[in-house]
């Protein structure tokens, strides 16, 4: 059985940067917390907890210490509160997310109604939305955008993990809604590259394994993209979840991982697949 690992599997630039910053802060010791999970990888969050860094839902109970801002960013009000409390802030917000926040802020100040393409329940989107001082709408698809009211000036940004296709569909729908539209391409290339590569790989193999947190939006999207081309696609968080039955009659296995999946988790999965393959051949 041949195992092919996607070249772009695992940490993207923003996640790598955020985890490095978090582990460096943890090494310094002292009271250190992250505001929400640093990235959407329960295993990385657990490692940080073992080093004494706990994830907080909010900073209302914090009076001193270091607060690490998660890679997805946080609401502007929470950042202001951290500054007011004079906490030491380690801002690990992904620069691409930061860009989307800044666009929303400036569009809003310039009198545009803002449309954010994304998942309203996702912390990244909730953070981006908080930078709007005027009207702001969150839509998940072109169909949802078609239900928006008429607006004079529309500014569009996207959650960084959205597909380019979805952004285009929303923009098409917005063209019928306003006289002036400004669109900022805030989708991260790492997401698009991973999806394209995963599609290509899924079409060449008999079974596809996608590794990453069940709470990771980009990993879930990878699994969806792969399933369309290879129904035998399995989304797992760690090696122990691999089932030998999945590999029955399989000649080629494709493996990819979300942008918040650490290399050590990918390595463990590859080792376990190798072990299953050996047992199968005995």
Curated annotation (Swiss-Prot):
Coiled coil: none annotated. Dimethylallyl diphosphate binds at residues 40, 72, 122, 216, 218, 260. One of its GO terms (molecular function) is metal ion binding. It catalyses: isopentenyl diphosphate + 2 oxidized [2Fe-2S]-[ferredoxin] + H2O = (2E)-4-hydroxy-3-methylbut-2-enyl diphosphate + 2 reduced [2Fe-2S]-[ferredoxin] + 2 H(+); dimethylallyl diphosphate + 2 oxidized [2Fe-2S]-[ferredoxin] + H2O = (2E)-4-hydroxy-3-methylbut-2-enyl diphosphate + 2 reduced [2Fe-2S]-[ferredoxin] + 2 H(+). Pathway: Isoprenoid biosynthesis; dimethylallyl diphosphate biosynthesis; dimethylallyl diphosphate from (2E)-4-hydroxy-3-methylbutenyl diphosphate: step 1/1; Isoprenoid biosynthesis; isopentenyl diphosphate biosynthesis via DXP pathway; isopentenyl diphosphate from 1-deoxy-D-xylulose 5-phosphate: step 6/6. Its EC number is 1.17.7.4. (2E)-4-hydroxy-3-methylbut-2-enyl diphosphate binds at residues 40, 72, 122, 160, 216, 218, 260. Keywords: 4Fe-4S, Iron, Iron-sulfur, Isoprene biosynthesis, Metal-binding, Oxidoreductase. The active site is at 124 (proton donor). One of its GO terms (biological process) is dimethylallyl diphosphate biosynthetic process. Binds 1 [4Fe-4S] cluster per subunit. Isopentenyl diphosphate binds at residues 40, 72, 122, 216, 218, 260. [4Fe-4S] cluster binds at residues 12, 94, 188. The keyword 4Fe-4S applies. The keyword Iron-sulfur applies. It comes from the Bacteria. Its cofactor is [4Fe-4S] cluster. Belongs to the IspH family. Catalyzes the conversion of 1-hydroxy-2-methyl-2-(E)-butenyl 4-diphosphate (HMBPP) into a mixture of isopentenyl diphosphate (IPP) and dimethylallyl diphosphate (DMAPP). Acts in the terminal step of the DOXP/MEP pathway for isoprenoid precursor biosynthesis. This is 4-hydroxy-3-methylbut-2-enyl diphosphate reductase. The lineage of its organism: Bacteria, Pseudomonadati, Thermodesulfobacteriota, Desulfuromonadia, Geobacterales.
